[in-house]
Each structure stands twice: as structure tokens, then as C-alpha cells.
Amino acid sequence: MTPIAQSALPRIIRTPWQIRWQPELIGTLVFLIHQGQVLLIEKLTGHGQGKINGPGGKWEINESLLECARRETLEETGLAVDNLTCEAELRFVEQAGPQWLGYVFVAKVFSGELTQTQEAKPFWCDLGNIPYRFMWADDAIWLPKVLKQAQQSSSRPQPFVHNFLFNDGELLAHEPVSQTQLSFSVTQPRAAQFVRQS
């Protein structure tokens, strides 16, 4: 596992279950909306294999979260996305595994040809028929809010923050966060490696 950047890491992220929580892995998810549908993938390998989700993956050194979102979408679907907006920060406090921090983006502009890859089988899904039973348990909590925000054409709402508590992949509890400031800038590149503080 690649450690995260010290220069961008908040000293303390407070969650209801850990006062000094720090993510070990940071990643992105992208939901491309087009003509009343959203692009989803069936994950064929790696973390979340067999589950349905948006394209996404781990944030790498020297790229911004926006660049990560674009790269992962291209790698997993063959589509180049543009005009991404960050809609949410998700904090996954895991009692029996790695700690994840996720950033959810929405795009409405894309180019290219939809292509299945070794990592993912992409498909379009009606916005009113999302297969939550084949997704992570938390997706049904935050994804409807993301999609609703993304379809508002007037003023853009601030990204929301939500905490989730898991034990070995089982969702135990969740809580929205009143703050709207994200823990990381979505436009700043990830810098030097960071050794996680205990």
C-alpha cells in the first residue's frame, strides 16, 4: 500500500468512532450522467470485485484527485471525462481492515467509445433503476444525494462529507458531517510519501 502525502494530510480527522483518524488509502469514484442514465461498472478484479459501482481507483503520487478521477475512468471504461465536479467526501472507518477516504465526482461531458477492460465491465443504467443490491451497502445512503445534487441546474451545492463505520466490510453505522470543507484539495497534486502516524 502506498502511503499518502504528508504535505496535504490534515493532522487530525475527527470521526464519531476515532478522534484521530487517518486514511491509509485515498481514491476516487466517478458517475457520468448522460440522457437520464448513469455510467456504472461491474468490477472484475481487485477491491470490490463482483460489485457494481462507478469507475474509480487509488490516488497516485504527482496527480491531483481530478486527474485521478479522469485517469481511472479512462482506464476502466475507455471514456475521457471532462468538467468533473466533486460532490462528496466519504470517510470509511474500518475496524478490521484498511482505512479509506473517497472522493465522489460527477461528469456530464465525455468522449470516446465505451469499452470493457480487464478491470471493469461498464454499462449505462437508468437513473431510476440503480442496482443497489449489487453495490456496497453504503452506496444506497450517499449515491442518491450525489445524483440529486448533480441534477440541480441552479446554484451548485457544496460537496457533502459523510462518515461510515465498517467491520470487515459490514456497515455498522453512518453519520453525515456538518462541515463542507474537504480534507484534501481536488486540484493539488499528491506530493511526497507519508509514513502514517500512530
Identify the function of each model-found stretch.
Residues K148-F160:
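Short helix-capping/linker segments at secondary-structure and domain boundaries
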Residues V106, T115-V146, N167-S185:
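NUDIX/MutT-family hydrolases
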Residues T2-L29:
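Acidic, metal-coordinating catalytic segment for phosphate/diphosphate chemistry
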Residues H34:
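A cytosolic small-molecule/anion-sensing beta-strand core signal
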Residues F160-D168:
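Conserved anchor residues at repeat-unit boundaries in beta-strand-based tandem repeats, strongest
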Residues L29, Q37, K121:
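Conserved beta-strand and immediately adjacent loop positions that scaffold enzyme active sites
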